[in-house]
Amino acid sequence: MAFRPRKRFGQHWLNHEPTLQAIVAAADIQSGAPQSGSLRDRLLEIGPGMGVLTKQLLATGNPVVAVELDRDLCLKLRKKLGQRENFLLLEGDVLILDLNALLQDFPQFSPLNKVVANIPYNITSPILELLLGTIQKPRVPGFETIVLLVQKEIAERLTAQPSTKAYGALSVRMQYLARVDWIVDVPPKAFTPPPKVDSAVIRLTPYPVEQLPGDRRLLDQLLCLGFANRRKMLRNNLKGLIAPEQLTTLLEQLALPSTARAEDLSLEQWLELTNLLPTFLPPT
């Protein structure tokens, strides 16, 4: 009897060969020779489901660690793929598991350096934080490449440009932490069962933490305040931090009008604001 997807786990299984190939290609998986160690990519897959994408990843010859929450699916995956030497299946919640600790006994699968996954859409935000960290606390060490199949709305927000409807704090945060590339659109019919939303494949290339510019704590604070109320102008959202007339002067230095809203500032302008703001504040 066929295994029926469970709604509570947000299960929609990808069965569209062109999309599967696009995901694997976007990861640019380097196989190298087994004895070369560091030249081989070690892959993390979140929510392998029925193992369709997993099999394509395993076909590269690279070590693949798959994390699956559904116990029944784990049983099926072990029967189907459990004999592969380059496959390690971990049962549990990826948001809770300590992967570093679990992989200490499996050195051939560690350290994981790339993520390739069709993630459950209902936990996209916490998974992004797990994989990238936050502005104040980026993930260290970071992954080299993260290829995710996500809801199209999320892809639009992650890649959005200033002064657009989709642009918000999430856009700035993710673009600060990583380069974000839109790979391909994915229609509902590519899944079983078809979701009620469109999807897209994105690739995140995290920046090394030592290359992240600016005062990360202040940038995070400004984003929280600035986007707290999208309808308000920055001079109102930030008035608890800086006097409106001072902010107007500061915005002029950024070639922005005094009526600017948070959504009008590019990542570069947010960083400029972060760098200039301390010169307008009284000494502490």
Swiss-Prot record:
What's the Enzyme Commission number for this chain? 2.1.1.182
Q: Could you tell me where this protein is found in the cell?
A: Cytoplasm
Q: Does the keyword Flavoprotein apply?
A: no
Catalytic activity field: adenosine(1518)/adenosine(1519) in 16S rRNA + 4 S-adenosyl-L-methionine = N(6)-dimethyladenosine(1518)/N(6)-dimethyladenosine(1519) in 16S rRNA + 4 S-adenosyl-L-homocysteine + 4 H(+)
Q: Which InterPro entries match?
A: KsgA/Erm (IPR001737), rRNA_Ade_diMease-like_C (IPR023165), rRNA_Ade_Mease_Trfase_CS (IPR020596), rRNA_Ade_methylase_Trfase_N (IPR020598), rRNA_adenine_dimethylase (IPR011530), SAM-dependent_MTases_sf (IPR029063)
Which GO biological process categories is it annotated with?
A: rRNA methylation
Q: Which GO terms describe its cellular component?
A: cytosol
Q: In which broad location class does this protein mainly occur, judging by the first location in its UniProt entry?
A: cytoplasm
Tree of life domain: Bacteria
Keywords on record? Cytoplasm, Methyltransferase, RNA-binding, rRNA processing, S-adenosyl-L-methionine, Transferase
Binding of S-adenosyl-L-methionine, residues:
12, 14, 47, 68, 93, 118
- UniProt GO molecular function: 16S rRNA (adenine(1518)-N(6)/adenine(1519)-N(6))-dimethyltransferase activity; RNA binding; rRNA (adenine-N6,N6-)-dimethyltransferase activity
Q: Which family does it belong to?
A: Belongs to the class I-like SAM-binding methyltransferase superfamily. rRNA adenine N(6)-methyltransferase family. RsmA subfamily.
Task: Read off the NCBIfam families from this record.
Answer: ksgA (TIGR00755)
Question: Any idea what job this protein has?
Answer: Specifically dimethylates two adjacent adenosines (A1518 and A1519) in the loop of a conserved hairpin near the 3'-end of 16S rRNA in the 30S particle. May play a critical role in biogenesis of 30S subunits.
Q: What is this protein called?
A: Ribosomal RNA small subunit methyltransferase A
Task: Write down the species.
Answer: Synechocystis sp. (strain ATCC 27184 / PCC 6803 / Kazusa)
